A protein has these predicted regions:
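Basic- and aromatic-enriched surface patches that contact anionic nucleotides/nucleic acids
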Residues: 53-129
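Short alpha-helix boundary/capping and kink motifs at helix termini
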Residues: 2-57, 61, 67, 72
Length: 129
């Protein structure tokens, strides 16, 4: 038996209106998802809205692949998140990451080193507070 999930209202939006909550994309993952990202209908992104921002919670790689293929819009749906995401967005903005075109594409090894290092340090800092 298949599990049923609640229906989500999808909204089509310009990809450059979306604020990333990450800083990097993994080159290997970009190459992998590029094979199935061919139109805006192939990209559905969970988001939250805060003030004037529309924040990407997941799907940064799909979003990046779409932008590389010249896809201008994707579909999004509202969901919920934990408080930490706002810290990640603040750090992204500090790094001048305001939209998908600002994400840094890194090799798999560099991605794991950079992203996991940031996350580990974030967790350590939060535990120390």
């Amino acid at each position: 038996m298949l599990k049923e999930f609640p229906h989500k209202n999808l909204i089509e939006i310009d990809i450059f209106e979306l604020q990333p909550s990450q800083f990097f994309v993994n080159e290997d993952k970009v190459n992998a998802v590029s094979s199935f990202v061919n139109s805006s209908k192939d990209v559905v992104i969970p988001i939250i809205k805060k003030d004037e921002m529309i924040i990407v919670l997941d799907g940064h790689t799909r979003l990046y692949a779409a932008s590389m293929k010249g896809i201008k819009t994707v579909f999004v749906f509202d969901t919920e998140t934990e408080q930490y995401i706002y810290d990640f967005v603040q750090e992204a903005q500090r790094r001048n990451i305001k939209n998908v075109s600002d994400l840094k594409r890194l090799s798999h090894e560099d991605y794991e080193k950079e992203w996991y290092s940031y996350c580990d340090n974030y967790i350590k800092d939060k535990k120390g507070e």
